Amino acid sequence: DISRYQHEPSSQTVRRGRRRRKVTYPILWNQLRITSLGSMSKKRVEGNVDYPISFIYIKSTEGKSLTNRYFRADYAAARKHGYRVGAYHFFSTRTTARQQADNFIKNSRYQKGDLPPALDVEPSAAQISQMGGIRVLLKSVRSWLEDVGHRLGVQPILYVSQSFVNKYLTDDNPDGDYLRKNYQVWIARYGEYKPDVHLAIWQLSPDGRVRGIRGLVDINVFNGFEEAFRDFSSISAHSLPQPSPR
């Protein structure tokens, strides 16, 4: 997955006239190949790493108003070069689910055949506390997923860490239990992994390398064979169970 950090991998600046601007780098779309799984992946690979890329998630929005200035160009270029592409939203604990859903839908380009929208949830313990606790957070996460799913007609997926699953997507948190049972998960888990959720995508490394991209790149693997991958975007929002009373 990519965001503005693949275009701006450091704080390096260059002077242009009277101003200094960040050094930016293009993505060389016709050269993309995975060349390293990174230091945090425990996968053992014989020989050189040189893998093709079949799908790309691009950060679109964050919170109620932040956007990725590179999203539209990267989205169009990825599709032009034949990659399956999806957009993701970085969840904020400082604003409502509805405002964040509005921001995502307004600024993302979901088209038929794209990968399902994804919600990236990575709050710290302090942020959860400031929001009002885990039950408030989970209710807001669920609201975003249901709202976006209803408005786009496709069921989003949930990006979380293994520790988030273990702590919060449990049967003693009603909304957490609902999310675990009814949504596919894109999980960040570094090392060997036996899925204990409805796994869609496994992020096996946050520090991989891809030819054609400057800086580090998250490396992700789809959980399934080619036929399942082709069907991945056809997960209808309307196939979800009716929301339980809250």
Residue ranges and their predicted role:
Residues 116-196:
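Catalytic domains of cell-wall/extracellular-matrix polysaccharide-remodeling enzymes
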Residues 65, 94, 165, 194, ...:
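Flexible, glycine-rich phosphate/dinucleotide-binding loops
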Residues 1-46, 174-246:
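Functionally critical loop-and-helix segments that line ligand-binding/catalytic clefts
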Residues 90-96, 120-128, 154-155, 219-228, ...:
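Low-complexity, flexible helical/coil segments
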Residues 1-151:
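Substrate-binding cleft of extracellular glycoside hydrolase catalytic domains
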